[in-house]
Amino acid sequence: MKKVVSIALALLMVAIMLPVMAMAEDVYTTLPTASNGEISLDKDVVLSAQVTINENVTINFNGHKIYNTATFDGYFILVQKGYTVTMKGGDIVDSRGNEKGTITTVCNHGTLSLENMTISRGVGIAVKNDEDGPTQCGKLTVTNCTITAGSNQIKGQAIQNWGEATIESGTFNADVNAWAYYGGHAGSTTINGGTFNCNVQSLQLNYVSTGWPTTSAQTNINGGTFNGNVATGYQVGDQPSDAVPAPEGDVTSANMGVAGGTFNSDVTEYAGDTLVVENNGTYYVGGTARDAIENATSGTFTVKKAKNDTSLTVKSGVTIVNNSDITITVNDKKVPNGESYTVPGTITIIVPSDGGNTTTTPSTDNTKNPGTGANDFVGVAAAMAVVSLLGAAAVIRKK
């Protein structure tokens, strides 16, 4: 009997350990070694220590993810300067967070491309594009990625940029900030598209002990949808730094340039002489503004900024309010600053044909009689008379 019990207990222990053994075998505990410049994941990676990349490599996630153990400390991935790395097609999930927001998941000092990635973390920095002094910085490109950092109460930074970053597309659920500090490289971010659900900022940082930077953080926006604030600003202190008003004296400011996109905040001051229009609290800039106006079938659009030769083609029923400080042209009509113009509807004249069918002749309300320059009321009356005569002629023929 004791032998039977012993065998049963042994089998039970094997049954208990099998899932643990399988789990241990089903994940990597660090990134595999590259082969011919490529790492192709065939299972998830659970990190207990930082991965430092000091080679040119492409990491194909193949739908797998990298995540951390409960005791993990450091960066998930550190790309050292001088190396080119591409990460694509997977998830990076960092469960850590702190109130200071100083924990970083991915840190880049080299050249890093993120493609079709989902990166999420608690309060902190999802991707830091770092620098190594005024002339050496990380270069980052982001394409079709979803990046989230923070919680509903405390937002983190999706991208903290001290180097050169280009965002082509994606969804960003935390701040995207370009930074500058005294003695360091000023961050420069170019945004060509994407959806930004938090703030996009260019920020000048004073560590207090070093003073204000003498170079400008820069953000250039060419397109995208921006649901948070887009602005420049000043910050003081170590992380987390505090926003402060513009300091007095000769202090270098950050730069923001907006050439296109859709915004929930007023970005007119950053648009130069690019077309800016507003409709119900939404601001459209550049080609996006022109598309919004010319595709609209109703509503009121306020032109906030425009070039001297701006000409718009607008559908009937749309009202254009010109607050651009210059005269613009709407459907060949001059609209001075401070005035508005509603594009009139159409008049449809139905003329019976010999076969009993009708032909439709559209005409706008503001069409002029070419001989007199008068409004078309005379023409409409004449057309009605013609319709009556044609109708009578048709009746006579039917008899």
Residue ranges and their predicted role:
Residues I59, H64, G89-G90, S95, ...:
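Solvent-exposed loop/turn tips at the surfaces of repeat/solenoid architectures
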Residues G338-T372:
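C-terminal low-complexity, Ser/Thr- and acidic/Pro-rich disordered "stalk" regions positioned immediately N-terminal
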